[in-house]
Regions:
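PLP-dependent amino-acid enzyme catalytic core
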Residues: 1-173
Length: 173
């Protein structure tokens, strides 16, 4: 099952999500990416549903998606200007924070990564947090960068857990 926000992906992207055949069903959700993610999390948390079917995710809710992404960063760092030991600095689009989380995993595993900076669009949940506010999910705003249109990035709590406190998290990003 694939869930995606109706009207928030291009026709080409929608085709790519819908063309898999009989064993994969794609559903357009009247809402945002956050709404799709909420539905997926509800399904994963439903014990009756989990007893009937095997569930998993292919997005960054799952560490199974994040670990291969960490390998991309290790590969990039290994080939960065051909200079061993020279850290690779990153600017990562925010979205659901899966890529940023993967970068932190890669660095924790010893990949020579320098600064990890986040790029945000009009969905400013994280800039509000970094500007000294409390973390508070925001309604999703539709932009041209639909992969970044997330008002409640799931991996924020994961990043928060990996740092001692919010000050350390802010310093790391």
């Amino acid at each position: 099952v694939i869930l995606y926000p109706d009207g928030r992906v291009s026709p080409r992207q929608a085709h790519g999500l819908e063309c898999w055949g009989d064993n994969v069903r794609a559903f357009r959700v009247d809402g945002s990416f956050d709404d799709c993610q909420r539905l997926a999390k509800q399904a994963l948390a439903d014990p009756d549903l989990r007893a009937r079917v095997t569930l998993g995710t292919a997005n960054s809710i799952s560490l199974g998606r994040m670990l291969p992404q960490a390998a991309y960063y290790a590969h990039a760092a290994a080939h960065h200007f051909g200079s061993p030991g020279r850290p690779l600095h990153l600017i990562v689009p925010t979205g659901n924070l899966g890529n940023a989380s993967a970068a932190f995993v890669a660095r924790a595993m010893g990949t020579p990564l320098g600064e990890i900076r986040l790029a945000c669009n009009a969905n400013d949940t994280l800039p509000r947090f970094f500007d000294g506010g409390d973390y508070a999910a925001q309604p999703t705003r539709t932009t041209l960068a639909n992969a970044m249109d997330v008002g409640a990035p799931s991996n924020f709590e994961r990043l928060r857990h990996w740092h001692r406190d919010d000050a350390q998290l802010c310093a790391a990003l």
